[in-house]
Amino acid sequence: MDSSMSTKKKTKLSVRNQTCFKKSSLSSSSTAKKTTNLSMREQTMFKKALELSTLCNIDVCVIYYGRDGKLIKTWPEDQSKVRDMAERFSRLHERERCKKRTNLSLFLRKKILDDTKLSEKVLEMEDSLESGLRVLQDKLLLLQPEKNQTEFGQTRAVSSTTNPLSPPPSLIEDHRHQQWTEPLMSGVSNTEQDLSTSSLSQNQSRISVFLYNHDNRSFYQVPDSVSSFDQSALLGEQGSGLGSNFDLPPMVFPPQMQTQTPLVPFDQFAAWNQAPSFADPMMFPYN
């Protein structure tokens, strides 16, 4: 048991020693890396100062202090030049110091402000362009009817010059209107004529013809078969065959008269069935 316990203690001690050695080795390696990184940064900073003074043709100095506040290194290596530049900078006014001083936070803030100003300018320009576009669109809408009128006038002028014998559009429209109205008027006149002829035929079918005898002053009624033919032919034959002793009364066509009273007074005792030798035709309406 004692031997086993001693072996365990030895192993624990060896493990602790190994871990401590590892920690020391790690710390030494980290410090070595830090020193190398710092030395590389110093070289880079001094190199950038040299490039800046050469390219911009300005006075640049670098003063490098340690953690304890001791001066470690300067650039340029001549400390008199560095002291002269530091004194000149300290004698400047606060405004001049701000102009010649560059801070990262101030630089970023200035960049952000410049970006916002640029965006504001872009927005203002966009608004002005949109307003100008609206004005142009309104003017275009106002000029569109005038453009259509001018194009219509030009087309009319071109058509008149190409075909001088063609009538103007106004005459063509009047002719078309007349072509539409003439059939309507002719149709109306034809219907009126048909109505007049039909009414005349109806009236003729309701008219009786009477012959007047001057000798015995009596009337004689012509049969219906005789009254149905053309009365103008009958009157023409009577006018050519009769002498001047027989007077032809005027033809009377009363429209649809509902009376049987004769138009000319006659003797009520005259012989109606006896045909006279000479007679004048008289017409009376009947139902």
UniProtKB/Swiss-Prot annotation:
It holds the Pfam family SRF-TF. Residues 151-171 are annotated as: Disordered. GO terms for cellular component: nucleus; plasma membrane. GO terms for molecular function: cis-regulatory region sequence-specific DNA binding; DNA-binding transcription factor activity; DNA-binding transcription factor activity, RNA polymerase II-specific; protein dimerization activity. One of its GO terms (biological process) is positive regulation of transcription by RNA polymerase II. InterPro entries: SRF-like_MADS-box, TF_MADSbox, TF_MADSbox_sf. Residues 30-78 form the MADS-box domain. Disulfide bonds: none annotated. Keywords: DNA-binding, Nucleus, Transcription, Transcription regulation. It is found in: Nucleus. The keyword DNA-binding applies. It comes from the Eukaryota. Interacts with MEE14/CBP1. Probable transcription factor that may function in the maintenance of the proper function of the central cell in pollen tube attraction. This is Agamous-like MADS-box protein AGL53. It comes from Arabidopsis thaliana (Mouse-ear cress). The gene is AGL53.
